[in-house]
């Protein structure tokens, strides 16, 4: 149980020059510490790459930490635990000669200090070990009342899900109910094709859209469960995913499997009660792709393509739910446009984890395309717009459709021009923005169908 933690708030690196590093701890806290220190205490600890130990190891209290690295690789990771109440922060660096030291493996991963929290980690190339201050119930009894405040929190996210009972929270997080972007990206291709199948001069069938909306939510949730069950070992090693319920052992595989079974039953019940047989068969045929996707990142650099096959299946099913079958001249280019769209947004999304993906050994288009991502995704963006144009031609859409689709392309241009592939926050922002692209194109289809000449629509149906 970690009793005290080190706050890494201010730091700087200087030019490399030797094989050792000096860690300067500056205490700006004038309160009394466990060792009865008063005022400002300064402790310098020097460790050497060759002997891998610390000297001058003493108890200190620190609100500010400065690292001066004089090695070729920064010694400290930029991740830290922060004291819950921002009060005294104590740690001990014990003599490495002690046999009971708790060792912390060194790690050279470098992330953003101000945005992340994690245990203190040192560069693994230096094989240096440090010990942390453990809770000792036999000493410092004055701090017993505060010990719970100094423990790393087991609540991963303080959001609206946290208001639910503890037994329910893991299932909600497993379903990603707090991250609806996946539902929107799954639903929009369904709504596109439902709208394209609507009669000329008419709004799309809202009841069918509602059915597909519920189905998109349930199936996306089921897909997340399948993905997390397959990837729990990888997820536990990736900073962004290590708090997922299965990876963090909040849920067992048995509990997750039961939950998945309930979701699939609900989905099949909805499909059987609401859709025609052609569409039922079409929806059922997508299930192998859904199950296959989580495993593809082990074998190919193109799991995003498989995700595109699954996520855009609604471009086929939505049309057949209205028309009774697929008009392939319309839905085929729409489906291909959707796959290309997925390649764009999910490659951007994958750039968030590319460093961790290399460490754990999984593949993605982010790693495959690397520094050429912007150019390659520009090609896929062109395929998105081309597929939408071909769909409009096959569906005999009015001029407004083509003007609107051309305007939609500006969103794809914007996100590829402004995304910083080396900044996870930028990647996430651009990924989420794709829900706007999906909505824009849906509105364009709806307005275009209202403007469509009914005589031209009859000619299409005869084909």
From Swiss-Prot:
The chain crosses the membrane at residues 181-201, 206-226, 257-277, 305-325, 330-350, 375-395, 431-451. InterPro entries: HB_polyprenyltransferase-like, Prenyltransferase, UbiA_prenyltransferase, UbiA_prenylTrfase_CS, UbiA_sf. Keywords: Isoprene biosynthesis, Membrane, Mitochondrion, Mitochondrion inner membrane, Transferase, Transmembrane, Transmembrane helix, Ubiquinone biosynthesis. Residues 137-150 have a biased composition (Low complexity). It holds the Pfam family UbiA. Pathway: Cofactor biosynthesis; ubiquinone biosynthesis. Its EC number is 2.5.1.39. GO terms for molecular function: 4-hydroxybenzoate polyprenyltransferase activity; transferase activity, transferring alkyl or aryl (other than methyl) groups. Residues 28-48, 133-152 are annotated as: Disordered. It is an enzyme of class 2 (transferase). The keyword Cytoplasm does not apply. Disulfide bonds: none annotated. It comes from the Eukaryota. Its main location: mitochondrion. Catalyzes the prenylation of para-hydroxybenzoate (PHB) with an all-trans polyprenyl group. Mediates the second step in the final reaction sequence of coenzyme Q (CoQ) biosynthesis, which is the condensation of the polyisoprenoid side chain with PHB. Belongs to the UbiA prenyltransferase family. This is 4-hydroxybenzoate polyprenyltransferase, mitochondrial. It comes from Dictyostelium discoideum (Social amoeba).
């Amino acid at each position: 149980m970690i009793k005290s933690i080190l706050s890494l708030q201010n730091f700087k690196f200087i030019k490399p020059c030797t094989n050792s590093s000096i860690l300067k701890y500056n205490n700006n806290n004038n309160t009394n510490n466990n060792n009865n220190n008063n005022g400002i205490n300064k402790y310098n600890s020097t460790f050497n790459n060759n002997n891998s130990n610390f000297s001058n190891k003493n108890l200190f209290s620190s609100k500010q930490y400065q690292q001066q690295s004089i090695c070729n690789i920064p010694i400290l990771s930029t991740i830290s635990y922060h004291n819950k109440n921002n009060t005294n922060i104590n740690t001990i660096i014990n003599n490495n000669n002690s046999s009971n030291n708790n060792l912390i493996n060194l790690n050279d991963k470098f992330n953003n200090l101000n945005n992340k929290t994690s245990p203190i980690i040192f560069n693994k190339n230096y094989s240096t070990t440090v010990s942390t201050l453990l809770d000792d119930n036999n000493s410092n009894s004055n701090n017993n009342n505060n010990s719970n405040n100094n423990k790393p929190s087991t609540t991963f996210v303080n959001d609206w899900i946290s208001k639910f009972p503890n037994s329910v929270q893991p299932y909600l997080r497993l379903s990603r109910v707090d991250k609806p972007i996946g539902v929107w990206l799954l639903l929009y291709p369904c709504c596109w094709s439902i709208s394209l199948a609507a009669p000329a001069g008419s709004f799309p069938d809202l009841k069918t859209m509602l059915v597909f909306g519920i189905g998109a939510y349930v199936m996306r949730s089921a897909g997340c469960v399948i993905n997390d069950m397959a990837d729990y070992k990888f997820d536990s090693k990736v900073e962004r995913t290590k708090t997922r319920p299965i990876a963090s052992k909040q849920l067992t595989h048995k509990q997750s499997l039961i939950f998945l079974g309930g979701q699939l039953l609900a989905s099949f019940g909805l499909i059987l009660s609401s859709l025609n047989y052609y569409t039922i068969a079409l929806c059922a045929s997508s299930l192998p792709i859904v199950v296959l996707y989580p495993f593809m990142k082990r074998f190919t650099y193109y799991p995003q393509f498989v995700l595109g096959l699954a996520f855009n299946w609604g471009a086929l099913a939505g049309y057949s739910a209205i028309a009774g079958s697929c008009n392939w001249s319309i839905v085929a280019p729409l489906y291909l446009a959707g796959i290309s769209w997925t390649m764009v947004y999910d490659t951007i999304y994958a750039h968030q984890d590319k460093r961790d993906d290399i460490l754990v050994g999984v593949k993605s288009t982010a790693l495959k395309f690397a520094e050429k991502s912007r150019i390659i995704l520009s090609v896929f963006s062109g395929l998105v717009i081309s597929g939408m144009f071909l769909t409009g031609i096959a569906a005999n859409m009015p001029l407004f459709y083509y003007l609107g689709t051309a305007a939609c392309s500006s969103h794809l241009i914007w996100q590829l021009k402004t995304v910083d592939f080396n900044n996870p926050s930028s990647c996430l922002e651009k990924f989420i923005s794709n829900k706007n692209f999906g909505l824009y194109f849906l509105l364009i289809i709806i307005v275009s169908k209202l403007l469509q000449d009914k005589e031209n629509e009859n000619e299409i149906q005869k084909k």
